[in-house]
């Protein structure tokens, strides 16, 4: 990956922006930054339809990876212009907030948009409800479509599933932006730098996590 980044930057005389990844450690971030990337995708195995960690044993919790890469970026001013993109594990607006507070400049989200009308995917009816097909890019099904099947000696690191249809993507975007704006008021932040400076991460118990959700709806 590092050599490919160097090659692209060389043949384009440094004019083509390059995003590389995915990585899970600050050390990997540094190597890509020194190769000349403009942004690094951070996160291995955290996607909702990814099974890389159970198939390979490789991966770090996405938020921990973001923190590690952010600290690596702070270690040298030469890396300050390299953006961090958190990729994986985004389910709720709070996950966006935590990613940005931990040091990410942006996120990549799949499932939350895959369920919308604006995303590609076949719509079906299952048990009286509308659903869409959601396929991992490393799934067996995608490999069969693109390459005629898995290559010998390889394994699928993703799965395919059906997810309930949500409606238009703009409603999802509005909800996530609303959550971010509200979070910034809670920590008295006027911008993303303020969000990082004013946020504090603490460990919580499973019961505290349960309390964080709207538990009043449970029967």
Model-derived regions: residue spans:
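Glycine/Thr-rich beta-alpha phosphate-binding loop at enzyme active sites
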Residues: 1-4, 16, 21-66, 115-125
